[in-house]
């Protein structure tokens, strides 16, 4: 899938996929929401509104109130690519979220996922 196709996807379509990935591994929607708010700076009410809106996934990240400065500590592979090596900034932000949800699904603690240690 090209970057542009990812950017044009509706957040209302992507958000349930992220939540379902966590739920399948006995994690919660609240944990996914905590990860998203930590990464993007959106408040919980803003996130809930955006999750049901027609905003594109690209604009969801472009308009993020405050991307967490510790997001650069996120390392590892998602979709076969090291997130820290992704050169296109918007795609890197999107893959950071993918990586964090992957870590949640793999059973990591929220403290480790949110780089609190």
Model-inferred region functions:
Residues 1-117:
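A charge-rich, low-complexity, intrinsically flexible signal that marks solvent-exposed coils, linkers
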């Amino acid at each position: 899938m090209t970057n542009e196709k990812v950017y044009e996807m509706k957040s209302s379509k992507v958000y349930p996929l992220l939540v379902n990935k966590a739920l399948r591994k006995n994690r919660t929607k609240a944990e996914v929401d905590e990860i998203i708010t930590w990464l993007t700076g959106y408040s919980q009410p803003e996130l809930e509104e955006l999750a049901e809106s027609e905003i594109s996934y690209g604009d969801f990240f472009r308009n993020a109130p405050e991307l967490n400065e510790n997001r650069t500590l996120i390392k590892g592979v998602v979709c076969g690519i090291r997130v820290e090596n992704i050169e296109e900034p918007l795609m890197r932000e999107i893959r950071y979220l993918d990586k964090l949800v992957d870590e949640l699904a793999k059973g990591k603690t929220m403290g480790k996922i949110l780089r609190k240690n």
